[in-house]
């Protein structure tokens, strides 16, 4: 894409290394490996590229009287009413265009810091002085079961009862899974005490398998609202596990379109009323 030869690339890298006074790459066993200092260079380069792309997009938007937003969401947020709320926000505001990217929470924060994202919808928050938050909602984890499951008629289940069930869980790097594991550990239990038969990253697949009684799962209640309204699955709390968390809109500290934040929040709350 740059239309330059490999020797020219090597020359540019060498010149940059001399200018910065660091080694960006090291050759180990015939492979080029990025050094620790090189990782910092790459990180800053991504940030500069993100800022440049934002500048170009903002200039185009100002000419066309449009607004383009790139919003990152976790797999949980993708499956709750936030996607519907963003679609309604675009439909109600001519000139607004949103690109929605789904990724892990750690990758979303990285993209937020490198200006690849304007906003991120995340569960919880981290201590980062560059990131600010607006509380969007409060969510909690529940046990999700088929409407034909014996638990469906119960108001609560115990952890010991849950040990006997076939469990379908999110992957180990998911925030939902980690919150469940943390609460198990606070009760002197481990995930290995449970019969985990499937680990899946796709929320829709998990809910479909639950509905067809292939197992039970621990999910955020917000991702089950549509199924609950249609009577497709049942959710209930687990005794001694109060797995609550915040859903936040995260944004960089130099983000200035606060009207967008509050408009999204308003549409989200209006969308929630449909499922009340």
State where each predicted segment sits.
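A short LG(V/I)-centered, amphipathic sequence patch enriched
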Residues: 15-34
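Secondary-structure junction motif
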Residues: 167-188, 258, 265, 275
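Alpha-helical linker/hinge and terminal dimerization helices associated
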Residues: 17-20, 41-63, 264, 268
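Hydrophobic hinge/microswitch elements
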Residues: 104-117, 122-123, 176, 182-233
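Beta-alpha-beta core module
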Residues: 129-135, 139, 154, 201-253
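A late-sequence structural motif
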Residues: 81, 234-276
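Flexible hinge/capping segments at coil-to-helix
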Residues: 130-141, 145-168, 172, 259
